[in-house]
From Swiss-Prot:
Keywords: Acetylation, Heme, Iron, Metal-binding, Oxygen transport, Transport. Belongs to the globin family. GO terms for cellular component: blood microparticle; haptoglobin-hemoglobin complex; hemoglobin complex. It holds the Pfam family Globin. O2 binds at residue 60. The modification N-acetylserine is found at residue 2. GO terms for biological process: hydrogen peroxide catabolic process. This is Hemoglobin subunit alpha. It comes from Artedidraco orianae (Barbeled plunderfish).
Length: 143
């Protein structure tokens, strides 16, 4: 699935509005993922505290949203722009790529609840396509 110029512009416009809240979005999205999809806890078993908003959850949420920020900046070539992250998730972290879709959904739920006026139907579809493209780029090294 490729992103149209309209999709790219919509993602960049939405990101410009939400970027300053990225850490909160990341914390809430990772917290939501851990609670709603408890099978994802297996990747974080080494953390002493998996409760929503814990120090580890906040730190990981910040990393996740840093990756999203990187993806927005590399939106014209996500495969190359996210190559290092793909390699890390495939070979070091060994994350099942199906979990990218789960986290993407949680990110969209949080953004839609925090920014309801900005999360228009057009922004929704463009962000969904973008996050799907990010997940595909992150899964690249699994092949």
């Amino acid at each position: 699935m490729s992103l149209s110029d309209k999709d790219k512009a919509a993602v960049k416009a939405l990101w410009s509005k939400i970027a300053k809240s990225a850490d909160v979005i990341g914390n809430d999205a990772v917290s939501r993922m851990i609670v709603v999809y408890p099978q994802t806890k297996t990747y974080f078993a080494h953390w002493p505290d998996l409760t929503p908003g814990s120090t580890n959850i906040k730190a990981h949420g910040k990393k996740v949203m840093g990756g999203i920020a990187l993806a927005v900046s590399k939106i014209d070539d996500l495969k190359a722009g996210l190559s290092d992250l793909s390699e890390q998730h495939a070979f070091k972290l060994r994350v099942d790529p199906a979990n990218f879709k789960i986290l993407n959904h949680c990110i969209m739920v949080v953004i839609s609840s925090m920014f309801p006026k900005d999360f228009t139907p057009e922004a929704h579809i463009s962000l969904d396509k973008f996050l799907s493209a990010v997940a595909l780029a992150l899964a690249e090294k699994y092949r």
